[in-house]
């Protein structure tokens, strides 16, 4: 059933609100701070937590993998944005802001990893 129409529909149904919410969150932070990093960081950390949770629940529960497709791949997959993070990092490097770029990279990766582990722990053991 991999790649079937019902699976694609589940992913698509989750993707639309996930992408819309990402746009809203990132645009909300844009006027408050001179750089867009905070909105991107927030959606990526929230998505990392949620994906960890969905993964753990999918592994430990007898629930249908449809939830993992709808929420994990669809909603939280489009809420998060690795490509925007990388472009923001590149812009910092191009501007010569090496310390800001390093801080952005470290904070994003460490916070995302902690969030994913916390979500997974909650789903698996909580």
Curated annotation (Swiss-Prot):
Coiled-coil residue spans: none
Compartment(s): Cell inner membrane
UniProt keyword annotations, A-Z: Cell inner membrane, Cell membrane, Ion channel, Ion transport, Membrane, Metal-binding, Sodium, Transmembrane, Transmembrane helix, Transport
Binding locations of Na(+): 77, 80
Pfam families: CRCB
Bilayer topology: Multi-pass membrane protein
Activity modulation comment: Na(+) is not transported, but it plays an essential structural role and its presence is essential for fluoride channel function.
GO BP, one annotated term: cellular detoxification of fluoride
Ranges that cross the membrane: 37-57, 67-87, 98-118
Task of the protein: Fluoride-specific ion channel. Important for reducing fluoride concentration in the cell, thus reducing its toxicity.
Protein name: Fluoride-specific ion channel FluC 1
Organism name: Parasynechococcus marenigrum (strain WH8102)
Gene (UniProt): fluC1
């Amino acid at each position: 059933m991999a790649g079937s129409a019902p699976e694609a529909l589940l992913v698509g149904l989750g993707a639309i609100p996930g992408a819309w919410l990402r746009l809203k969150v990132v645009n909300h932070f844009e006027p408050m701070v001179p750089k867009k990093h905070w909105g991107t960081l927030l959606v990526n950390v929230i998505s990392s937590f949620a994906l960890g949770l969905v993964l753990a629940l999918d592994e430990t529960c007898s629930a249908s993998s449809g939830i993992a497709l709808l929420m994990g791949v669809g909603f939280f997959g489009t809420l998060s944005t690795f490509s925007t993070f990388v472009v923001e990092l590149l812009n910092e490097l191009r501007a010569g802001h090496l310390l800001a770029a390093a801080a952005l990279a470290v904070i994003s990766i460490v916070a995302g990893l902690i969030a994913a582990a916390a979500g997974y722990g909650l789903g698996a053991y909580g």
